From Swiss-Prot:
Main location class: membrane
GO terms for MF: antiporter activity; sodium ion transmembrane transporter activity
Gene coding for it: napA
Protein name: Na(+)/H(+) antiporter
Organism phylogeny: Bacteria, Bacillati, Bacillota, Bacilli, Lactobacillales
Functional note: Na(+)/H(+) antiporter that extrudes sodium in exchange for external protons. Can also transport lithium.
Keyword rRNA-binding set for record: no
InterPro entries tied to this protein: Cation/H_exchanger_TM (IPR006153), K/H_exchanger (IPR004771), Na+/solute_symporter_sf (IPR038770)
Length: 383
């Protein structure tokens, strides 16, 4: 029953936090992240990241990306996939190189410095999606490019991570050799094509004929969670599966019914827990000891994604402000970077001495990113 009380506290606190944030013209997600900092070990210490909080937050981020997929215009995603490729590629090369360079400057072991760069290369677009949704700019060329780039980014980061682990430690994120892992992922994306084209429309049509309460919503959640599970199984982020599940269901005539119901479910319970869980990981006990390292690496984390995304978008003839908006949308690190950090620690590539400071770097860049994204979005869409 203890978790029920914790959940109640989180829901009340995030509602108040969102309200206060919006009153001051700040994205609501900032209020929810700060609630996590306040309630966690860095603040009052009332809530700790336990298994149930983790599971609820995982469902929250999956539902958030499912909603982003439902809201996305497939034709726009196809149209801006090419600029998304440029943005993702440069958004990985810049952080990996400058993350490694920063590690070398602080006299970190070479393998560990390389892993710093890989951690900074991971983008967690779920928080950016929340800002895009709040400002109603998901279905714009910038929003579609950010979403397309995040998909490519996730695939490339997984490949870089797999290769780096194999090269640096002789291990991998999967038990399979890299060529077989790539083949698995290729088949997964082939299955996504089949899902969008035929499977999802058939399943949603079947659900309409089932005499059971909320059969349509249940079927959509089965598709969402099933695709997330399969993505996780082959070494991709579960949010990639959720995003494409949303796109698949968005091609059916029950799209709006599914969106309204899943949005109510997600924002009532699971999504606030996800944003709070990010804030719960903050621990300021190591902050004063390594403040220079934390501040410089945070600056590197922000600038490399912003500039990499900017140059990638400029290659595709975006205006300067639009390109900066795309770059800003790629800054957030979130859960993907934390997962890579954990893998690095378990593989003895990240020393405990640097673990907490790196968590703080990831969380600081995640906290700052919505403000930067909102600023550049307002410059592009002033009205």
């Amino acid at each position: 029953m203890e978790f029920i009380g914790i959940l109640c506290l989180i829901l009340v606190a995030t509602t108040i936090g969102s309200h206060i944030s919006r009153r001051f013209g700040i994205p609501a997600v900032i209020g929810q992240l700060l609630v996590g900092v306040l309630l966690g070990q860095a603040g009052l210490g009332w809530v700790h990241p336990n298994i149930l909080v983790h599971d609820f937050s995982e469902i929250g981020v999956i539902l958030l990306m499912f909603l982003a997929g439902l809201e996305s215009d497939l034709s726009l995603l196809k149209k801006y996939f090419k600029p998304g490729m440029f943005v993702a590629l440069l958004g990985i090369l810049f952080p990996v190189f400058f993350g490694w360079l920063t590690g070398e400057a602080f006299q970190v072991a070479n393998n560990e410095a390389i892993f710093f760069g890989i951690i900074l290369a991971a983008t967690s677009v779920s928080i950016s999606v929340e800002v895009l949704k709040e400002l109603n700019v998901v279905n714009t060329k910038e929003g579609s490019t950010i979403l397309g780039a995040s998909v490519v980014d996730d695939i490339l980061v997984v490949l870089v991570l797999s290769f780096s682990l194999s090269f640096l430690t002789g291990k991998s994120t999967s038990n399979l050799p890299l060529p077989l892992l790539l083949l698995e992922q290729l088949f997964y994306f082939l299955f996504i094509f089949l899902l969008v084209k035929w499977i999802a429309p058939f399943l949603m049509s079947l659900a309409e004929k089932i005499y059971a309460n909320s059969a349509i919503i249940i079927m959509s959640l089965v598709i969402c969670l099933g695709m997330s599970y399969l993505a996780d199984l082959i070494g991709l982020s579960s949010v990639i599966g959720a995003f494409f599940a949303g796109i698949a269901v968005s091609q059916t005539k029950v799209k709006h019914e599914v969106y309204n119901n899943v949005e109510a479910l997600g924002y009532a319970v699971f999504i606030p827990v996800f944003f709070v869980s990010v804030g719960l990981e903050v621990d300021f006990s190591k902050f004063s000891e390594q403040i220079l390292f934390i501040l410089i690496l945070t600056l590197v984390a922000i600038l490399t994604k912003l500039i990499g995304g900017y140059i990638g978008a400029k290659f595709s003839s975006f205006s300067s402000n639009s390109a900066l908006m795309v770059g800003a949308g790629m800054i957030s690190r979130g859960e993907m970077a934390l997962i890579i950090l954990q893998i690095g620690q378990q593989s003895n590539l990240i020393e405990n001495h640097y673990y907490s400071p790196l968590v703080i770097v990831v969380l600081l860049s995640t906290l700052i990113s919505p403000l930067i994204l909102k600023y550049f979005t307002k410059k592009v869409y002033a009205n």
